Amino acid sequence: MGIKLINIGFGNIVSANRLIAIVSPESAPIKRIIQEARDRGMLIDATYGRRTRAVIITDSDHVILSAVQPETVAHRLSTKGEEDEISEVEAQ
């Protein structure tokens, strides 16, 4: 199994194998998670100064802010998985 990478906007790429959740930043619990990650030094801001639209939580407890909609990131994740499955079938 190879490394799957997902584009989260502005040329920033995250390993799909490390993702736990892709959520909207609007709710109070998610805002609290963002602030706690900032305090711990585990926050990665990939928004380039734009509005945060998706919060990505990884298995290493890093919290990544993205300016791309959560649905877009999820779609990129699902289409990437389909492409990998197709290439694996063709290789057999």
Swiss-Prot record:
Family matches, as InterPro entries: RemA-like (IPR007169)
Domain of life of the organism encoding this protein: Bacteria
One Pfam assignment: RemA-like
PANTHER family, A to Z: REGULATORY PROTEIN SSL2874-RELATED, REGULATORY PROTEIN TM_1690-RELATED
Entry similarity comment: Belongs to the RemA family.
Protein name in UniProt: Putative regulatory protein CKL_1364
